[in-house]
């Protein structure tokens, strides 16, 4: 069983919206070791800062293990309304987000500070879709 708690510092929820009918969950199992946890947390935090600075309309909630047993995991939860939102780009994040991130942090920073960090410090990222059935 996994018990996750919302991390308000890394969460971006501009209009305090509630979980919608469709959500994308990105699960990031972090490699063991404090340096891995810190690196992934910093990458996730920088994305939150960029979402705030660009006043994104898309919410992103961040959850972490409430009772880590030596293995930490972070879950990113994004609402979506249409399957077309998954065409191209970085799933979950707003269209054009990578370019806006690099305007804030510098050219090539998204790959270096997000993609390369997740590759080096996590055991990959899985994507799960949950949709409400009426």
What does each of the following model-derived ranges do?
Residues 1-134:
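Short S/T/G/P-rich N-terminal loop/turn motif that feeds into the first structured element of a domain
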